């Protein structure tokens, strides 16, 4: 059973924090001044660049990023053709995010999934893989390769892994959720790295504090660990560092010997 400390990253996202604190303190102050990666100048454009009409957002917080992207005039006008799946371990986050994206883009189709990212795919998403398997068998083609694929064209994991406990083992989520990505699809995300990547004494102190409180679980996370897993699971991988934040984008998912093949078996 998870300890109360390990559960802190789940319970910290109360309705009050999500409504009054998260956007300004976490996305505004912390990312810019503590971690060195401003949301408006770096994360929002990066999210928008890798956002598609069939998108899965894993670890949604307040829904700030998809809502901002969907609020653009041309996205808003095409909201009726947009499908967005929101996944989070916290029900408060899901409710807040769903309401926010629906307000930003009336007519959008959303699906909310409450699940732990380090567990197996929840049934509603495992069924997507099964649907794709059935489509492939009927069409006699390759999974994920058709424009009619049931899989997602893009998956995002922003500000997720630095919260999740489990050490390097938590990165199995990349393999698990890669199974939902079409061959032409893109996985993108960002994470605050561990103590080795601290940019100064204050960011190191702040990082240790967050880890002691259980808000973060990333004290030993490294760029090399993420790159190793991403390169194992994808043919094309790009990573960038902004302060202590690693941005990653991966495409051309490898199928052999992966969780994807296991799920289709």
From Swiss-Prot:
Coiled-coil ranges from the UniProt annotation: none
EC category name: transferase
GO function term, MF aspect, one: methyltransferase activity
SUPFAM superfamilies assigned to the protein according to its UniProt record, in alphabetical order: S-adenosyl-L-methionine-dependent methyltransferases
UniProt keyword annotations, A-Z: Methyltransferase, Transferase
Enzyme nomenclature, EC number: 2.1.1.-
Disruption phenotype: Completely abolishes the production of nectriapyrones but accumulates a demethylated analog of nectriapyrone.
Transferase recorded as keyword: yes
Reactions catalysed: desmethylnectriapyrone + S-adenosyl-L-methionine = nectriapyrone + S-adenosyl-L-homocysteine + H(+)
InterPro entries per the UniProt record, alphabetical: SAM-dependent_MTases_sf
GO biological process: methylation
Taxonomy, superkingdom: Eukaryota
Entry similarity comment: Belongs to the methyltransferase superfamily.
Role, per record: O-methyltransferase; part of the gene cluster that mediates the biosynthesis of nectriapyrone and its analogs phomopyrone A, acropyrone and zaepyrone. The nectriapyrone biosynthetic gene cluster consists of two genes, the highly reducing polyketide synthase NEC1 that produces a demethylated analog of nectriapyrone from one unit of acetyl-CoA and one unit of malonyl-CoA; and the O-methyltransferase NEC2 that further methylates the NEC1 product to yield nectriapyrone.
Name of this chain's protein: O-methyltransferase NEC2
Gene coding for it: NEC2
């Amino acid at each position: 059973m998870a300890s109360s400390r390990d559960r802190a990253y789940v319970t910290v996202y109360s309705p009050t924090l999500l409504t009054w604190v998260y956007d300004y303190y976490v996305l505004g102050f912390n990312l810019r001044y503590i971690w060195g990666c401003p949301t408006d100048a770096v994360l929002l454009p990066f999210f928008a660049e890798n956002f598609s009409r069939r998108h899965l957002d894993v670890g949604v917080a307040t829904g700030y990023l998809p809502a901002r992207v969907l609020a653009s005039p041309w996205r808003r006008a095409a909201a009726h053709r947009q499908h967005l799946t929101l996944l989070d371990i916290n029900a408060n986050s899901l409710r807040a995010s769903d309401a926010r994206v629906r307000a930003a883009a009336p007519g959008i189709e959303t699906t909310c999934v409450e699940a732990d990212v380090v567990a197996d795919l929840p049934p509603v998403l495992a069924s997507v893989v099964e649907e794709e398997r059935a489509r492939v068998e009927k069409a006699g083609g390759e999974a994920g390769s058709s424009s009619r694929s049931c899989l997602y064209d893009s998956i995002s994991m922003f500000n997720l892994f630095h919260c999740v406990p489990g050490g390097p083992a938590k990165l199995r989520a990349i393999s698990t959720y890669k199974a939902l990505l079409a061959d032409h699809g893109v996985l993108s995300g960002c994470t605050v790295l561990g103590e080795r990547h601290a940019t100064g004494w204050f960011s190191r102190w702040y990082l240790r504090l967050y880890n002691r409180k259980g808000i973060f679980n990333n004290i030993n996370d490294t760029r090399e660990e993420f790159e190793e897993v991403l390169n194992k699971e994808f043919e094309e991988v790009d990573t960038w560092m902004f302060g202590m934040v690693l941005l990653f984008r991966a495409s051309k998912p490898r199928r052999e010997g992966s969780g994807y093949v296991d799920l289709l078996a």
